[in-house]
UniProtKB/Swiss-Prot annotation:
Keywords: Cytoplasm, DNA-binding, Repeat, Transcription, Transcription regulation. It is found in: Cytoplasm, Nucleoid. GO terms for biological process: negative regulation of DNA-templated transcription initiation. This is Transcriptional regulator MraZ. Forms oligomers. Belongs to the MraZ family. Its main location: cytoplasm. GO terms for cellular component: cytoplasm; nucleoid. InterPro entries: MraZ (IPR003444), MraZ_C (IPR035644), MraZ_dom (IPR020603), MraZ_N (IPR035642), MraZ_sf (IPR038619), SpoVT-AbrB_dom (IPR007159), SpoVT-AbrB_sf (IPR037914). Residues 5-47, 76-119 form the SpoVT-AbrB domain. PROSITE patterns: SPOVT_ABRB.
Length: 142
């Protein structure tokens, strides 16, 4: 499972160097898509297959399910690391996430997240200011 947060720079062609700690995680390719809270999600291909299975199980008769699947799939883009361990982020996804020149690449269970640094700081500050409710953490073992 990938973990940690790494600040990087996006070049003028929309490429970012993948942190060494995450390269093996995505060595077979990855799927980039819109994430929650205005970030991007990057799933390794095997992980994306599991996500697809879960999304395919959502009811087509539910408007909210259809809207979420549309949001998630329509932004998806397949990518691979180049010979310099860079991943190219499509302009549409960079615009969605507010990524210009700087990015935070963060690990999360089963995926990576690409964040605008200001959004990242705000997301972390929000959790510090108002931690998750105890019932959400009932099964968490520290």
């Amino acid at each position: 499972m990938p973990f940690g947060e790494y600040p990087y720079t996006i070049d003028d062609k929309g490429r970012v160097v993948m942190p060494p700690a995450f390269r093996e995680f995505v060595e077979d390719g990855l799927i980039l898509t819109r994430g929650m809270e205005g970030c991007l999600y990057a799933f390794p291909l095997p992980g994306w297959k599991r996500v697809e299975e879960q999304l395919e199980g959502l009811p087509l008769t539910d408007a909210g399910s259809r809207a979420f699947v549309r949001f998630f799939y329509s932004g998806a883009s397949k990518a691979r690391l180049d010979n310099q361990s860079r991943v190219s982020i499509p302009q549409t996804l960079r615009a969605f996430a507010g990524l210009d020149s700087d990015v935070i690449v963060a690990g999360a269970p089963g995926r990576l997240e690409f964040w605008n640094p200001q959004r990242w700081e705000a997301a972390i500050a929000a959790v510090q200011a108002e931690p998750p409710q105890p019932d959400l953490l009932a099964n968490f073992v520290a």
